[in-house]
C-alpha cells in the first residue's frame, strides 16, 4: 500500500506569509487549482482522510466526496502566534522553538505532542493496510479494502509523517520544507514504512 501525504492548497493567509495553525480560512483561487492538480495526481481509487480544517477538507473533496475527518491530522497549535507574521515572533522564542521539540509556544502545542498524535493515525493506517478487516456478508465477503490511502493535512503533521517513516525524532521538522499542495509518498509493508518521495511538486507544473 502507498500512503500519499498531501499538504492542502494555498490560502490567502499562506499568500501573505502568516503563520497558519488552527485558524480556518478556505482555499483561494490558486489553492483550488492546486487541489485539482493533486486530485489528478493521486487518482480516485483511494481512501481519503483529512484534517478537519477547511483548507484541507476543500483539498480532500477535490479528490473524493467520500472523506473521513480525523482531528489528529490538524495543524500544530501555534497559540498566540497564529495568523501572525514570523517576524513578530520574538527572536529568543523562535530560537528555543527550533532547538527544542518539547518547547510550547504560548497557548500552543509542542512538536512532541503533535508527533505522537500523527503517529497514532499512521500506525492505524499501516495496521489496517497489513491486516485489513474483511467483510463476511454479501458480494464483498473476504474482500479487504486494499486501496492506497491519502492523508490531507498540514506542514507540521507532514513533517511528523516524515519522522515516522524514517524512524527519527521531531528534530527533523526544522530540516525539511513542505510546499503547498505537495505530495509525500510512503510505502507500507510488513517491513515497516519506507519513504518513496518527499515534497513532490511535479504535478503542479503539469500543463
Q: Which role fits each region the language model picked out?
A:
Residues 43-72, 187-207:
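Conserved histidine-centered catalytic loops in small-molecule metabolism enzymes
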Residues 36-40, 115, 119-130:
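Generic structural signal for well-ordered alpha-helical scaffold segments
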Residues 1-66, 109:
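Active-site-proximal alpha-helix that buttresses catalytic centers in soluble enzyme cores
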Residues 50-51, 116, 152-153:
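Short beta-strand scaffold positions
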Residues 11, 157-158:
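Short active-site segment of divalent metal-dependent hydrolases/proteases
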Residues 3-4, 46, 145-153:
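Generic beta-sheet signal
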Residues 79-88, 132-147, 163-207:
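Acidic, low-complexity terminal tails and accessory targeting/binding regions
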Residues 63-120, 197:
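Phosphate-handling substructures
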Amino acid at each position: 500500500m502507498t500512503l500519499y501525504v498531501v499538504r492542502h492548497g494555498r490560502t490567502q493567509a499562506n499568500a501573505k506569509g502568516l503563520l497558519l495553525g488552527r485558524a480556518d480560512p478556505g482555499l483561494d483561487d490558486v489553492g483550488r487549482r492546486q487541489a485539482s492538480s493533486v486530485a489528478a495526481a493521486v487518482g480516485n481509487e483511494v481512501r481519503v482522510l483529512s484534517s478537519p480544517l477547511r483548507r484541507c477538507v476543500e483539498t480532500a473533496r477535490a479528490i473524493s466526496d467520500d472523506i473521513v475527518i480525523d482531528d489528529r491530522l490538524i495543524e500544530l497549535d501555534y497559540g498566540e502566534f497564529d495568523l501572525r507574521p514570523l517576524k513578530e515572533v520574538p527572536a529568543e522564542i523562535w530560537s528555543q522553538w527550533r532547538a527544542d521539540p518539547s518547547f510550547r509556544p504560548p497557548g500552543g502545542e509542542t512538536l512532541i505532542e503533535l508527533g505522537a498524535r500523527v503517529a497514532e493515525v499512521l500506525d492505524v493506517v499501516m495496521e489496517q493496510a497489513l491486516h485489513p478487516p474483511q467483510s463476511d456478508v454479501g458480494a464483498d465477503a473476504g474482500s479487504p479494502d486494499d486501496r492506497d490511502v491519502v492523508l490531507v493535512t498540514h506542514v507540521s503533521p507532514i513533517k511528523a509523517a516524515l519522522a515516522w517513516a524514517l524512524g527519527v525524532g521531531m528534530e527533523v521538522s526544522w530540516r525539511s520544507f513542505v510546499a503547498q499542495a505537495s505530495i509525500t509518498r510512503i510505502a507500507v509493508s510488513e517491513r515497516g514504512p519506507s519513504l518513496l518521495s518527499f515534497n513532490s511538486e511535479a504535478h503542479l507544473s503539469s500543463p
